[in-house]
């Protein structure tokens, strides 16, 4: 009986950290890898690569915990989130706070193996991760904060590898913000009706009937900014082929969200994993010497 209770609690933590749903970690991982490859160039130090990959998974888990903690009063009123561990009572508020602290401490221990500038930048990463879930109460632009939080690994990666923050770093950072606002608006379109009822704000609500147009413009901005990164760093045809593939996926996303069907919008959101993957493959191939 005791083992059964322990097993149930571990499964609840597993769901709270979303380790059963890796999409969020992947959307955080791809821009991190882009930055490491451009900063290196093409050959990131193995330890730095390992630290950032592990940090992505730990901080994404921490972000999910604090997100559910912030939304614990709202999630019970939304069909998709009503059975999450906090509103269902499978995890207590104290347990969630303790888990968040443990995940952040583990992440910080990893960062301590890097240079001082990167350690200092990690403080901003924690602040952004903590701020994002609460922004939904005060602004219709929480997705911008999410983009900054998901993109902060980019300056950290550049700083860890080269101790510098060149123009390419910031172009990639702003590309990631545009990308995150686009894909998280698709995600928010799934819950838009419920969010309006309970008073949660999002870009999906702010953009209204212009949502598809603005998502499309953001996607164009992503490709333009990443294209400029490629030009500045002398990247070759493989990189631009990757961007072309990403552009084709953006067109497909526009097609399926045309009717604003909830399931279709969620599929469009999930498809962004392949956008990040294609850009990374093109980037990695561009640095290989054939």
Swiss-Prot record:
Topological relation to the membrane, as annotated: Multi-pass membrane protein
Location of this chain's protein in the cell: Cell inner membrane
One Pfam assignment: UbiA
Keyword Translocase annotated: no
Alphabetically ordered keywords of this record: Cell inner membrane, Cell membrane, Magnesium, Membrane, Transferase, Transmembrane, Transmembrane helix, Ubiquinone biosynthesis
Entry keyword annotation includes Transferase: yes
InterPro entries, per the entry: HB_polyprenyltransferase-like (IPR006370), Prenyltransferase (IPR039653), UbiA_prenyltransferase (IPR000537), UbiA_prenylTrfase_CS (IPR030470), UbiA_sf (IPR044878)
Function according to Swiss-Prot or TrEMBL: Catalyzes the prenylation of para-hydroxybenzoate (PHB) with an all-trans polyprenyl group. Mediates the second step in the final reaction sequence of ubiquinone-8 (UQ-8) biosynthesis, which is the condensation of the polyisoprenoid side chain with PHB, generating the first membrane-bound Q intermediate 3-octaprenyl-4-hydroxybenzoate.
HAMAP family found in the cross-reference section: UbiA
Protein name (database record): 4-hydroxybenzoate octaprenyltransferase
């Amino acid at each position: 009986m005791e083992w059964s209770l322990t097993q149930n609690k571990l499964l609840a933590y597993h769901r709270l950290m979303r380790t059963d749903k890796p999409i969020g970690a992947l959307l955080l991982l791809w821009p991190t890898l882009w930055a490491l490859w451009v900063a290196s160039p093409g050959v990131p130090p193995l330890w730095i690569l390992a630290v950032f990959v592990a940090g992505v998974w730990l901080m994404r888990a921490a972000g999910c915990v604090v997100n559910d903690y912030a939304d614990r009063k709202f999630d019970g009123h939304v069909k998709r989130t009503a059975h999450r561990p906090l509103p269902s009572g499978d995890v207590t508020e104290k347990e969630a706070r303790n888990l968040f602290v443990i995940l952040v401490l583990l992440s910080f221990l990893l960062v301590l193996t890097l240079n001082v500038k990167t350690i200092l930048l990690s403080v901003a990463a924690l602040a952004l991760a903590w701020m994002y879930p609460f922004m939904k109460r005060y602004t219709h632009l929480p997705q911008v904060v999410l983009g900054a939080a998901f993109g902060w690994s980019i300056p950290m990666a550049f700083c860890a590898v080269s101790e510098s923050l060149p123009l390419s770093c910031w172009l990639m950072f702003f590309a990631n913000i545009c990308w995150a606002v686009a894909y998280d608006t698709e995600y928010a379109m799934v819950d838009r009706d419920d969010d309006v009822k309970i008073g949660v704000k999002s870009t999906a609500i702010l953009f209204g009937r212009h949502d598809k147009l603005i998502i499309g413009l953001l996607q164009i901005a992503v490709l333009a900014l990443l294209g400029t990164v490629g030009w500045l760093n002398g990247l070759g045809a493989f990189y631009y082929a990757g961007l072309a593939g990403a552009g084709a996926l953006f067109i497909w996303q526009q097609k399926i969200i045309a009717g604003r069907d909830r399931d279709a919008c969620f599929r469009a959101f999930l498809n962004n994993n392949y956008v990040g993957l294609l850009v990374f493959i093109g980037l990695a191939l561009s640095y290989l010497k054939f």
